[in-house]
Structures are given as C-alpha cells and as structure tokens.
Amino acid sequence: VPNKNELEKMANLLIEGMESGCLGLSTGLVYEPGRYSVSNEIIELAKKIQKYDGVYVSHMRNEAEGLIESIIETANIGLEANVKVEISHLKSVGKSNWGKSEQALDLIEKFSDDGLDINMDQYPYTARSTMLKALLLNDTFNYENDLSPMGKSMPNEVLLCSVPNEKSFEGKTLEDIQKLYDLPIIETVNKLLDDVSDKILVAAFGMNENDVQNIMKNDLTMIGTDGIDVGSKPHPRAWGTYPRILEEYVDRLGILTLENAINKMTHMLLRNLE
C-alpha cells in the first residue's frame, strides 16, 4: 500500500496522462503489481480522472469464486469516484463457478438502474489468454480447494501459446510437459518458469459456453479483445474475435442480430470512451 507521498506521485502521473489525452484509469487486479492494490488507493486515483470525464476500466480482482464481491468492489470504486466503469473480459471461471453469470449480470444491471454508468466487455471464447506465471501466482494449479482469483484449469486445459527459448513446446498442453518432466503439476510449472522462460503465454480453458452467451446477450456488454499475437500458437482472440462473433453467434447460433453485433463491436465502444 503506498504512503501519502507515493500516492501523490501516482496521482500526478495520472493527471499528466489525462492532460496528454489518456481516456481513463485501468487496473489489472489479478496481475503484478496491481494485485497488491486496495480499494481506497484506487478510489483516490480514480477521483483524479473525474473532471476529465475519464473511465475506470478494471480487470477485476477475482473472476471465480469471488466474482460477485469483485463486481461490488469495482462498482463501488466508480460510485465513490463518480466515474464511468467498464469491467474487462467479464467471465465466470472454473467449473465450480459456472452459472454465476446470471447473478453477476443481475448485480451489474442493478448498479446501472441505480444510476452508475457501468458496462462490460467480452471476448467470445471459453479459454482465456494470460501468462503462465499469473496462473501459478493465483493458485490455479492448487486443486485442494476452489480458491483461485483466476479459477482452476486442469493440465490438459492449458495450452502453451508462446514459449520463449523452447519453441518446440508451443502447441503442447501442460499435461504434455508434465509427462515429459514426470513431476507434479506445480513443480512442472515452476520448472518451466525457472528453466525455460518466465514469460510463457498460455490459453487456459475454464469458462462455460452458456455463461459466454448469457453475458454476450446483455445490453450492457460490448465485444472487444486485447489478445497478444505472439508465439506460433497464439490465442485466436488476437485476430478472430470479430469474425467469430459474426460467423458463430450471428449466422450460426442467432444469439445476436447483425445490427446488435455491429453496435456492440463499434458504437458502444466509442460511446464508452467519449
């Protein structure tokens, strides 16, 4: 937690950014170093973007068993700072959390109905794209309990997308590497990070298609992605998000009309960043 002087320096940097044309404040509360931030710290910073009509965008603290609490935290930051809120990549991760999308959407809609300018974005896949190190630090591979801010994924559900220094591992699953190393899963991941690279990108399955569709249909949901197109087997959201929406969810499944899909991919995004 920053002291008063450190928080003031952070605020000044934020103001400098807003004066230079930035659109708001973004946090990644499952990643280093954002995972150590507390709500009061973020509220004080978010207050600095209010006069610029900035937006607070958050990759929330917990997208699994703590999903509801994280939505409340995110919304309260917006309320306390009097700023717009966007939830990044709304999802409910881990089989024990499948079905929570309905409760999550009801809660977000209530905040919206009560006057908070809040919405969310989503990518149309059941696998997330992230750093292997982040999954390890968030207890994804500790199967003794359901506690993990990023949800649980089994070794066969984690695909290695980019492996610096060992391209032959790209396209393999953690289960493949675990068999190669003949080690328990956590030791396998640690060996990969220590001996090969600590910058391994993965695609980790863990969401349910019904939740994806429920979130997609909501009037507050925008479609977008920040996927990283590196490695020989990158997560397809880096280039396939919009084609997948049109082919799978408009043409094949009819989850969205063409007009609604285009609105979610264009006008809604622009309106949120005005």
Please place each PLM-identified region on the residue numbering.
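Polyanionic/metal-chelating signatures
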Residues: V1-N3, A81-V83, K91-G227
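Flexible loop/turn segments at secondary-structure boundaries
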Residues: E32-Y36, E63-L67, V93-N97, T126-M131, ...
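Secondary-structure transition/capping motifs at alpha-helix termini
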Residues: K47-V55, N76-E86, K110-D117, R252-L258
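Acidic, glycine-enriched loop/beta-strand segments at the rims
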Residues: I200-V212, L253-N263, L270-E274
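Generic long, charged, amphipathic alpha-helical segments
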Residues: G227, H235, L246-I262
